[in-house]
């Protein structure tokens, strides 16, 4: 049986990566962005780093900030309606896993309206159409959601999380800019960094691993192991290497899966409402 490997069409890495957003949008003929970003990122000026790029280029956008930790079915449904009303033709996800997951759900449902009941997307989703194009701008170095084919939505009614796996949801372009992560506090940097390291280790030992995924996971372990302490201290070098290391881990585990750790914290984070 052949092994499949799914990645972004394009990705930008390093300081100033977000400066390429305008060129990518114009080059693809996009007219208006629907920006998914949580209220804290708006409050502390992180989202503004991206909107400044769009403003400078004269590109239109609308900001949707009703992003919750552990996004629920209802959150995503509201997002779908807001997207439809906005007149946007692509999404920009700014944030950690929650913003990315919300954007993926919105993009998939808009492009595949027959799956408007998000519960029908749980597991390996049988969608036929690619999601509305997503530009992903991570602000944490942990989940690597900008390069993965899965997203997690909470069913609040049943108090459970649904993992949705769909090759059609992967962002078309990722902009992995360490400057977007520089405002993370030490505790969050450490926690997301360990999340990334766990992804790399589990991806390497999972049953689905093979030579190509091994290459990514081993390199990710190497980079994260030397970079995490520096990232916690907010050194430019540490931030940049962690941004790259967690992305490389995502390139691997998105294609071969993980182990028991994500299953465990899926249940542990429901009461605390945390998603990094």
Predicted regions and their residues:
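Glycine/threonine-rich beta-strand-loop-alpha-helix active-site module
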Residues: 74-81, 85-176
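Carboxylate- and glycine-rich phosphate/diphosphate-binding segment that chelates Mg2+/Mn2+
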Residues: 150-256
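Predominant activation on well-ordered alpha-helical scaffold segments within soluble catalytic domains
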Residues: 22, 51, 62, 77-80, ...
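Short, hydrophobic/aliphatic alpha-helical segments
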Residues: 1, 76-88, 179, 236-265
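N-terminal small/polar loop signature for handling phosphorylated ligands or for N-terminal nucleophile
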Residues: 42-115, 227-239
């Amino acid at each position: 049986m052949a092994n499949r490997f799914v990645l972004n069409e394009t990705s930008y890495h390093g300081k100033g990566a977000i400066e390429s957003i305008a060129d990518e949008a114009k080059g693809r003929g996009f007219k208006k962005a629907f920006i998914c970003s949580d209220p804290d990122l708006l409050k502390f000026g992180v989202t503004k780093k991206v909107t400044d790029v769009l403003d400078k280029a004269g590109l239109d956008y609308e900001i949707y900030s009703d992003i919750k930790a552990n996004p629920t079915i209802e959150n995503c449904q509201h997002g779908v309606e807001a997207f439809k009303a906005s007149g946007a033709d692509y999404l920009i996800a700014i944030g950690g896993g929650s913003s990315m997951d919300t954007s993926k759900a919105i993009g998939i449902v808009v492009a595949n309206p027959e799956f408007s009941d998000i519960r029908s997307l749980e597991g390996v989703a049988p969608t036929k159409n690619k999601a509305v194009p997503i530009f992903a701008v991570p602000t944490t170095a942990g989940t690597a959601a900008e390069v993965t084919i899965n997203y997690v939505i909470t069913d609040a009614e049943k108090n459970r999380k649904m993992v949705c796996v769909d090759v059609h949801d992967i962002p078309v372009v990722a902009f992995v800019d360490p400057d977007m992560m520089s405002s993370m506090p030490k505790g969050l940097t450490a926690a997301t960094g360990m999340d990334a390291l766990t992804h790399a280790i589990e991806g390497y030992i999972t049953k689905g691993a093979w030579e190509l995924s091994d290459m990514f996971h081993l390199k990710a372990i190497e980079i994260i192991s030397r970079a995490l302490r520096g990232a916690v201290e907010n050194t430019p070098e540490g931030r940049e290497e962690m941004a790259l290391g967690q992305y490389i881990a995502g390139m691997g585990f998105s294609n071969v899966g993980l182990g028991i750790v994500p299953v465990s914290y899926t249940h542990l984070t429901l009461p605390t409402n945390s998603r990094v």
